[in-house]
């Protein structure tokens, strides 16, 4: 649910502040928030320096991969509605199944495989254009989001492996370091640095308050998801997380009806049917996977 809220906040920020700017600037704000969290984690968990350099490098790589996935996701969100982008996160569990099978030894039952197939069908169905552009597949959207899901699955796998071997907050600390490194590299690019500083000067109060709230919501969802990885198989956690699509769709309808200035989704009869069918397919798939 927190991630669904964050998706709509991301869309609002993209529409209001980043329509003509590179969405990579939004990733800089994410990096800023996690860097500010580092000393707090270090204070409460002094053992963060205990892992070997090799372990630290791999955990930091998970953070870099996470930010790379976020960049693909934001580029997709810049040109599509939130409820159209979100279903593609459902491809994540399938990547998670494969990775967990080969790396962690997790196996899939026939029911889980059927559920995974329904999730994919739902994600693909919502990406089809109808009407004037009937049956035109949104290739760019699919490429961005499938790549995003694969990268996120690899990042989650690395996090789980080390969180089980080391410690949750220590692993989180070094993953945040990797996210901070990614943001630092972006900030070193002159064009991104200029856009970042310009946005801060022209929209300081609104941008910082909304973005900070969004990043805290996203951080809460991310930490909850990562902690769940310690309690359940990777594929199961990702499948349950795929319910984000249903919440995104529901919140999108509420916003369009009651708060259209904040976010607007297409509410034509066919669009509602298409998104509704996709949501049902995804929900059925999740139910089969988690049963």
Task: Provide a role label for each language-model segment.
Residues 1, 95-150, 154-155, 160, ...:
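Juxtamembrane helix-loop boundary signature in multi-pass membrane transporters
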Residues 16-25, 72-88, 164-170, 223-246, ...:
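Structural motif at transmembrane-helix junctions in multi-pass transporters
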Residues 32-37, 88-102, 117-118, 177-182, ...:
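Alpha-helical transmembrane segments of compact multi-pass small-molecule transporters, enriched
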Residues 13, 76, 102-104, 108, ...:
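Hydrophobic/aromatic residues within transmembrane alpha-helices
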Residues 34-52, 102, 124-134, 180-206, ...:
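Membrane-interface helix-cap regions at the ends of transmembrane helices
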Residues 5-32, 154-181, 233-239:
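Juxtamembrane helix-loop-helix junctions in multi-pass membrane proteins
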Residues 1-4, 50-66, 104-121, 146, ...:
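Structural signature of hydrophobic alpha-helical transmembrane segments
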Residues 42, 47-72, 89, 139-150, ...:
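Loop-to-transmembrane-helix transition segments
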């Amino acid at each position: 649910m927190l991630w669904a809220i964050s998706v709509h906040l991301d869309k609002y920020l993209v529409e209001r502040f980043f329509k003509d700017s590179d969405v990579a600037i939004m990733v800089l704000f994410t990096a800023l928030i996690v860097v500010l969290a580092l000393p707090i984690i270090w204070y409460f968990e002094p053992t963060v320096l205990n892992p070997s350099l090799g372990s630290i490098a791999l955990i930091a790589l998970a953070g870099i991969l996470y930010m790379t996935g976020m960049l693909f996701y934001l580029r997709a969100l810049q040109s599509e509605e939130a409820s159209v982008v979100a279903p593609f996160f459902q491809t994540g569990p399938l990547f998670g199944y494969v990775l967990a099978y080969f790396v962690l030894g997790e196996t899939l039952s026939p029911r889980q495989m059927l559920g995974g197939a329904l999730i994919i069908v739902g994600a693909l169905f919502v990406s089809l254009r109808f009407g004037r552009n009937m049956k035109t597949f949104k290739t760019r959207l699919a490429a961005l989001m499938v790549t995003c899901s694969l990268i996120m699955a690899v990042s989650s796998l690395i996090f789980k492996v080390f969180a089980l071997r080391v410690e949750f907050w220590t692993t989180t600390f070094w993953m945040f370091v990797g996210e901070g490194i990614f943001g630092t590299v972006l900030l070193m690019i002159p064009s991104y640095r200029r856009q970042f500083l310009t946005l801060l000067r022209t929209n300081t109060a609104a941008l910082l308050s909304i973005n900070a709230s969004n990043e805290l919501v996203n951080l809460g969802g991310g930490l909850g998801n990562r902690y769940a990885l310690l309690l359940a198989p990777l594929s199961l956690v990702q499948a349950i997380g795929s319910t984000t699509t249903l919440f995104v769709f529901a919140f999108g309808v509420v916003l369009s009806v009651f708060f259209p200035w904040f976010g607007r989704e297409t509410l034509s009869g066919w669009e509602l049917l298409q998104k509704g069918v996709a949501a049902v397919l995804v929900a059925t798939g999740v139910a089969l996977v988690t049963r």
